[in-house]
Amino acid sequence: MKSYIFVDYKEKAFGKIVDNKLFELKFYSPFLFNIYRAKVVNKIDSINAYFLLYDDGKKAFLKSNKKFKIGDSVICQIIKEEFDDKLATMSANFRIENEDYYLYRFKNKGFPKLKKGRKKNFENYNKLLELKEKLINEENFTPSPKLLKTYNEFDLYCEKNKDLELVELDIKNNKIISDSIKNIKEKKIYKDDLSIIINDLETLCFIDVNSSKKKSTMDKDDFYYKVNEDLIDFIFYNLNLRNIGGMVVIDFLKSSKNDQLIDKINENIKKYFKTYEIYGFTNMGLFELSIKRRGESLYKKLKEKELI
């Protein structure tokens, strides 16, 4: 079985295939978080606001307590894309990062901070400081505007997964991805003879576990536990793929082996999520947990891009 990361430059999509199965699908912006040497072309002194030219014919809005003159060069980062008739928003307090550290130009006295769950890495710490100084020194050069650093999510993803091959493809014509996208449209999804129903609501996500057509000669309690156990990885795989977070309630088949089931859940959830909290079973027999949100669900993203 093959594992690799992929990119579709046309759809600005990227993600990972693990053992010939879609693990995640994301989308990136070609401008958001890029760092530029921009040129001040206008200003409003009363509100410390500046209008910057950051690319050919492209302007952005910057608010800064630091004073600039028209014609000055400013090192800044796009933090909000242009939308309808509104200009993009830039910040002089740029953020740079690698897989271990992140750094803001002005916060924390300009020193890198270790990312949650990462181990100290002297080489990556120094690399970030060197990059910061290099970017700041760019204010002294010409011409402006100039793109200095692309810093979209795809770049960071490639850095994080540098041990995997990067494959360029068309997500619409790749069978693994297109089949997964079709699945995401459905609430009821199957794993062999078993199934789950995913209802992703505004306030929570409710998942119903079904044995469907599966038959067994096992004791009923053992059979229900086995069905629940067999679906644990399938449930968290689909929550991760669909990028569903927040409160999650799972209606497992009723079994007396809930403690064993919680142990299995703890083993499996770590493969897909870093930040979560397990509350356990309620008096009504429903299993509750919360997962840290990571932006819009994949279903909403696909709908916005008219891919479903």
List where the protein language model places each region.
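Extended, charged alpha/beta regions that create polyanion-binding interfaces
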Residues: 1-34, 79-203
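Short aromatic-glycine-enriched beta-strand elements
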Residues: 12-13, 46-52
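Beta-strand/loop nucleic-acid-binding surfaces
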Residues: 24-29, 51, 57-68
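Conserved catalytic network of the ASCE P-loop NTPase/AAA+ motor domain
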Residues: 30-31, 43-44, 67-69, 189-190, ...
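Short nucleic-acid-contacting surface segments enriched for D/E, G, S/T with interspersed K/R
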Residues: 33-35, 65-75
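Conserved glycine-centered short motifs in functionally critical loops
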Residues: 50, 82-84, 94-104, 192-308
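SH3/SH3-like beta-barrel fold
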Residues: 50-54, 76, 88
